[in-house]
UniProtKB/Swiss-Prot annotation:
Coiled coil: none annotated. Belongs to the T7virus internal virion protein gp14 family. This is Internal virion protein gp14. One of its GO terms (cellular component) is virion component. It comes from Escherichia phage T7. Keywords: Host cell outer membrane, Host membrane, Membrane, Viral genome ejection through host cell envelope, Viral penetration into host cytoplasm, Viral short tail ejection system, Virion, Virus entry into host cell. Component of the cylindrical core that assembles on the inner surface of the capsid during capsid formation and plays a role in viral DNA ejection into the host cell. The inner core is composed of stacked rings of gp14, gp15 and gp16 proteins. Following binding to the host cell surface, the internal core is disassembled and gp14 is ejected along with gp15 and gp16 into the infected cell. May form a simple channel spanning the outer membrane. Interacts with the portal protein. Interacts with gp15.
Amino acid sequence: MCWAAAIPIAISGAQAISGQNAQAKMIAAQTAAGRRQAMEIMRQTNIQNADLSLQARSKLEEASAELTSQNMQKVQAIGSIRAAIGESMLEGSSMDRIKRVTEGQFIREANMVTENYRRDYQAIFAQQLGGTQSAASQIDEIYKSEQKQKSKLQMVLDPLAIMGSSAASAYASGAFDSKSTTKAPIVAAKGTKTGR
């Protein structure tokens, strides 16, 4: 009768092991999918940051070219003013004022170019920073939502606990007793006296 009680215990242990194996595979698949998603988010963020860096570089080159052009115009204008003043033989505060006004105009234009570049760069930098922080928080959430695998010891002890519990309940019900409390019916056997 011992084997009749041991079979369900063994089956429950096998089911527990099978369930743990299926759960471990599911957790591993979810973890792998989460990590692939995190890598894709990081790749997209890197591409976006590279694109924004190229935009910032382009804005810098545009501003540099515009400043170079303005400096050339300034040199020509100041040279023309000096030549005109020299040819007219005029001197004094009025002539100095004409030079200062012309220089001030070029300085204001150069400052506008510089300010426009700074504004564009700040917008690009804010986009890079926002994209990077958003990606970091998404990746952090992916890693926080990962389920943890059971330890190897836990994977061994859980089925043993289930089997031990089944064995204890079977023992308590008397399934392992060598003397059975129920008698087998021999009524159906031919030629056997039943004592009636």
